[in-house]
């Protein structure tokens, strides 16, 4: 055994030496190696931070220095979550994968507040655990003046007054914008919302993530909910944005170029974006939701500190509703106690994007994963019927100013500048304070004079509510965040996403177009992206370090296998050893040992919550179970209801249930009497809603691939098909048995269903589980 250890050790050392020599040789010729990763060279003055200049010497230009080592290192996301985790064992450092009890700094809800309140009351709660933790903002259906909607708003107001909850009325602004501008979302804290775009808070260094309605009710009642710390991906920005390129172009590029679920169900930490304005960061973080991430967090840097200093000074001089939360004392504390990722923090993956190589980009139609350079779409002369400068993503004062600039510059050539004939241009500020800033600057009036139609500060057409929805066959271009089929109107309409200036230019010209501000930098031929940090030497050194770690682990495994081989042989020869013995999962009372049914197959990836349950029904609180079953999957396939039957097992592609936090995406499938959903992978927020509402789900990528292989030559390609295949999920044995149409069958091991999840589902969902705990 000593000889074996020595041989393995010598082998590892030899390989390490060879790879180290390769690194040394690469480092000595750095000037040649790194040049291919530069975006462009120029002799003109560069407006950039010192560290970003092309020829600035840095230590890494001469040799790679390994970052200092911290014991049990944590990412920024893990550090922030650590501060808001309750009940941890002494000395416990949380890491990705851990389940924790999370007590967020703030929990925001919007028009879904009343359904949450009903859940809160139904579980037997009578008092909000911490009324300073909770914020209500009415923002989604603010144009709806029906008696039913006004009554709901009145009930929310009365509930807030009774319990002393901070609340903002309809028309004040979009909840996520209020959370940021009023200082509820704060750097280094955790703020959640029962809305999927709470990721936006990451733009100011706050860990913002979505919860669902039942979670919110639990937070109201107990101050906390459960949360699994996600794997963390690090995204490094290199270079600086050229003029005419915005934060919206950055996030569209990330969604479209890294479109293979690289960050699905991850939290993202951004680095290297020191030059990005805060409004651009808010846009980028906001749409990390569409990228598939659970959070998108920027670091606290000088740009952010300066931004808060400005707001604190304004509050000190003129007062303001946020003065108790945004003031110099609090900014001082923030500056002195910045949370940062440990230098040797471990990330699930690392990606980079060279900002200098970006150009204006448009997403669509009807998908954020289709990203096309603006110049390509301009060449197609795509007519536009409706344009939208709305949403929490891009309707702040800076966005309105950018749109107004388009019309101001056009007015230099033609004083009477108007929106193109046949185009409707809708504008709604992210909040009243942002609208007031735009009004004082004259930008709001410029857009109105050009013919823009003003909507109240709120979500409106972004969520498919109110005035200006897309009609069948129409084309729309929006500065919002989501262009799923049917979300902004008709399922036969086409929706594109773009920056505010592109939206304004398109409204002006009557077709998808830009204002002409972008000038391609010399030498830029393509967008530079990749895995790693974008620093060739550092990435190469880290890859060698990973290789050494892998060798050591393999050596340990080889030694352990050799040391135990005799014992293993003896055990295998023992008559008591049961061949194929399998561990069995304990099944709790009330939970089925097996779930079985015929497979109905929806062969699409990224089926989103709008596809599962249309947004136009989301804020109708009295929709019957029968109606929910009728409209289930309507935006994905209008024929779904004809194919799917009670008791069927729905099998879908990858990333099923991405999109919003609406719980009806789960309850509509239950209304359709579908007991189990099988997919290649699930969006995290759908998984959370499923568990909370007692819908079972299991990931079986092999089944999806097998079905696709079987039907790959089918020329019809229906969105939904009955397969004649049968599936049995043996929960006790943690496996699925699939019987294909020809009678052949096969098995696949799946993850064990833990007891706590069984208990919630057996109780009929989290709401009933919490009620049982309270009653006990």
UniProtKB/Swiss-Prot annotation:
One of the protein's GO biological processes: lysine biosynthetic process via aminoadipic acid
Keyword terms of this UniProt record: Amino-acid biosynthesis, Iron, Iron-sulfur, Lyase, Lysine biosynthesis, Metal-binding, Mitochondrion, Transit peptide
Pathway in which this enzyme or protein is active: Amino-acid biosynthesis; L-lysine biosynthesis via AAA pathway; L-alpha-aminoadipate from 2-oxoglutarate: step 3/5
Co-factor(s): [4Fe-4S] cluster
Record PROSITE patterns: ACONITASE_1, ACONITASE_2
Residues reported to bind [4Fe-4S] cluster: 392, 459, 462
PANTHER family per UniProt: HOMOACONITASE, MITOCHONDRIAL, HOMOACONITASE, MITOCHONDRIAL-RELATED
Family from the record: Belongs to the aconitase/IPM isomerase family.
Protein name per its UniProtKB record: Homoaconitase, mitochondrial
Organism listed in the record: Gibberella zeae (strain ATCC MYA-4620 / CBS 123657 / FGSC 9075 / NRRL 31084 / PH-1)
């Amino acid at each position: 055994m000593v000889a074996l250890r020595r041989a393995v050790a010598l082998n590892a050392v030899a390989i390490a030496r060879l790879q180290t020599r390769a690194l040394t040789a690469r480092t000595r010729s750095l000037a040649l190696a790194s040049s291919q990763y530069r975006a462009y060279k120029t002799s003109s003055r560069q407006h950039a931070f010192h560290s970003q200049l092309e020829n600035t010497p840095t230590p890494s230009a001469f040799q790679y220095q390994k970052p200092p080592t911290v014991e049990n290192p944590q990412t920024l996301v893990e550090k922030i979550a650590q501060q808001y985790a309750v009940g941890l064992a002494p000395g416990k450092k949380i890491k990705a994968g851990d389940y924790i009890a999370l007590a967020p700094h703030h929990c925001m809800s919007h028009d879904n507040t009343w359904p949450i309140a009903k859940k809160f009351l139904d579980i037997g709660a009578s008092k909000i655990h911490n009324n300073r933790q909770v914020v209500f903002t009415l923002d989604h259906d603010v144009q709806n003046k029906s008696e039913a909607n006004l009554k709901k708003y009145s009930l929310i107001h009365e509930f807030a007054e009774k319990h002393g909850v901070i609340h903002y009325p309809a028309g004040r602004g979009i909840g996520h914008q209020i959370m940021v501008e009023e200082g509820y979302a704060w750097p280094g804290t955790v703020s959640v919302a029962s809305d999927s775009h709470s990721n936006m808070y990451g733009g100011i260094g706050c860990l913002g993530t979505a919860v669902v309605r039942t979670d919110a009710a639990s937070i109201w009642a107990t101050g906390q909910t459960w949360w699994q710390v996600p794997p963390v991906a690090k995204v490094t920005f290199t270079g600086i944005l050229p003029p005419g390129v915005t934060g919206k172009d950055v996030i569209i590029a990330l969604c479209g170029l890294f479109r293979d679920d690289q960050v699905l169900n991850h939290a993202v930490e951004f680095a290297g974006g020191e030059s990005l304005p805060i409004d651009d960061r808010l846009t980028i973080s906001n749409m990390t939701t569409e990228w598939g991430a659970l959070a998108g967090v920027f670091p606290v840097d000088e740009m952010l500190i300066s931004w808060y200093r400005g707001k604190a000074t304004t509050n000190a001089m003129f007062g303001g509703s946020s003065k108790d939360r945004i003031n110099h004392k609090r900014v001082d504390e923030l500056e002195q106690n910045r949370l940062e990722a440990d230098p040797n923090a471990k990330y699930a993956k690392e990606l980079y994007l060279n900002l200098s190589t970006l150009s204006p980009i448009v997403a669509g139609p009807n998908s954020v994963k289709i990203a096309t350079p603006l110049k390509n779409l301009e060449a197609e002369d795509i007519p536009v019927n409706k344009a939208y400068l709305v949403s929490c993503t891009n309707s702040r004062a800076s966005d309105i100013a950018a749109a107004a600039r388009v019309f101001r510059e056009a007015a230099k050539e033609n004083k009477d500048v108007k929106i193109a004939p046949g185009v409707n241009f809708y504008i709604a500020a992210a909040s009243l304070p942002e609208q007031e800033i735009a009004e004082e600057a004259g930008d709001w009036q410029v857009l109105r004079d050009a013919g823009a139609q003003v909507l109240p500060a709120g979500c409106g057409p972004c969520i498919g509510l109110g005035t200006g929805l897309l009609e069948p066959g129409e084309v729309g271009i929006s500065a919002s965040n989501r262009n799923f089929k049917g979300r902004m109107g008709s399922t036969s309409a086409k929706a594109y996403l773009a920056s505010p200036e592109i939206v304004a230019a398109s409204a002006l010209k009557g077709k998808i177009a830009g204002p002409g501000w972008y000038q391609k930098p010399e030498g830029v031929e393509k967008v530079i992206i990749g895995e790693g940090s974008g620093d060739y030497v550092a990435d190469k050194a880290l890859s060698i370090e990973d290789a050494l770690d892998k060798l050591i682990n393999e050596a340990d495994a080889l030694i352990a296998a050799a040391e135990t081989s005799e014992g293993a042989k003896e055990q295998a020869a023992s008559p008591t050893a049961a061949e194929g013995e399998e561990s069995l999962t304990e099944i709790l009372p009330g939970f089925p040992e097996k779930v079985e049914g015929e497979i109905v197959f929806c062969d699409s990836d990224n089926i989103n919550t709008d596809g599962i349950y249309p947004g136009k029904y989301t804020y109708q609180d009295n929709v019957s179970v029968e109606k929910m079953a009728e409209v289930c999957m309507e935006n994905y396939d209008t024929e779904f209801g004809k194919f799917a039957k009670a008791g069927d097992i729905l099998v879908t592609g990858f990333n099923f249930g991405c999109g919003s936090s609406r719980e009806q995406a789960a309850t509509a499938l239950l209304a359709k009497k579908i007991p189990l959903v099988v997919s290649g992978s699930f969006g995290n927020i759908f998984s959370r809603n499923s568990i909370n509402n007692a819908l079972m789900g299991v990931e079986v990528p092999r089944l999806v691939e097998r079905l696709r292989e079987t039907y790959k030559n089918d020329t019809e390609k229906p969105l939904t098909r009955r397969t004649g295949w049968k599936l049995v999920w043996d929960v006790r044995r943690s496996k699925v048995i699939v019987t294909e149409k020809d009678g052949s069958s096969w098995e696949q091991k799946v993850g064990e269903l833990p007891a706590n999840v069984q208990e919630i589902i057996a109780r009929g969902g989290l709401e009933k589980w919490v009620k049982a705990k309270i009653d006990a």
